[in-house]
């Protein structure tokens, strides 16, 4: 009996099953979802005195040569010892105290060894998610990731359930639709203009004016985003000429 056709058919069925199970990224709107209003903040990092709204969150960021340089220095877990708590590896994070609801954030970015650069939105007074994380748009060398963290990966209820191995199906159901990944390709050493629009429960990312990521999810519509944070994983990532506008839905 020739079993080769059966094996081929089995492989095709298995592949089709996995393809059906893979989450499908949403269609990206071709036009902006947010309409710019007044400019809330601007920094080209060339001034002699840093704006007081910037602040350290996780080391290490510094201004050099008219650029904001981020380097992940908490790059490994350090176990608890001598009465000191465990320290987990974490991307470098720099905070900006500019409250928004709907907004457009634009910055120049460059990879110089970094594996990830992102723009995120938080509400420190919100206790339903870890550290008040609301949403973020991540740029990696091979993809763009859009995240609703309030109702997804940083949601405190979900994080508690993740500790119970019997709750995997429940967690997966709660996480469905809370993130989207889009293939992309970025070059180290090259400057890009990274734009993130937030309008209601929608978030759209663009690189050099071309839309590269989109997500519609309830957590993104969180009414109070008390601050914006810039993140860099790996070594090193640069930001330049950042601007933040208040905005309204373009529709």
Which stretches of residues belong to each language-model region?
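Short, solvent-exposed beta-strand-to-loop segments that form ligand-recognition rims
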Residues: 208-227
């Amino acid at each position: 009996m020739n079993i080769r056709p059966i094996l081929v058919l089995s492989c095709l069925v298995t592949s089709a099953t996995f393809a059906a199970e893979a989450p499908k990224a949403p269609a990206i709107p071709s036009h902006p979802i947010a309409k710019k209003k007044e400019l809330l903040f601007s920094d080209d990092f060339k001034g002699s005195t840093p704006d007081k709204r910037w602040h350290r969150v996780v080391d290490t960021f510094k201004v050099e040569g008219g650029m904001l340089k981020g380097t992940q220095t908490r790059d490994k877990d350090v176990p608890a010892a001598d009465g000191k708590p465990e320290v987990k590896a974490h991307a470098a994070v720099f905070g900006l105290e500019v409250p928004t609801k709907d907004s457009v954030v634009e910055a120049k970015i460059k990879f110089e060894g970094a594996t990830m650069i992102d723009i995120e939105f938080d509400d420190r007074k919100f206790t339903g998610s870890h550290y008040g994380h609301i949403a973020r748009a991540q740029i990696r060398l091979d993809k763009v990731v859009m995240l609703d963290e309030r109702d997804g990966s940083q949601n405190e209820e979900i994080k508690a359930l993740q500790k119970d191995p019997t709750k995997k199906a429940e967690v997966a159901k709660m996480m469905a639709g809370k993130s989207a990944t889009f293939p992309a390709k970025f070059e180290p050493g090259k400057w890009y203009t990274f734009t993130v629009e937030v309008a209601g429960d929608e978030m759209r990312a663009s690189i050099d004016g071309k839309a590269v990521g989109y997500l519609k999810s309830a957590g993104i519509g969180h009414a109070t985003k008390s601050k914006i944070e810039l993140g860099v994983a790996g070594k090193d990532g640069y930001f330049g000429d950042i601007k933040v506008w208040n905005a309204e839905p373009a529709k």
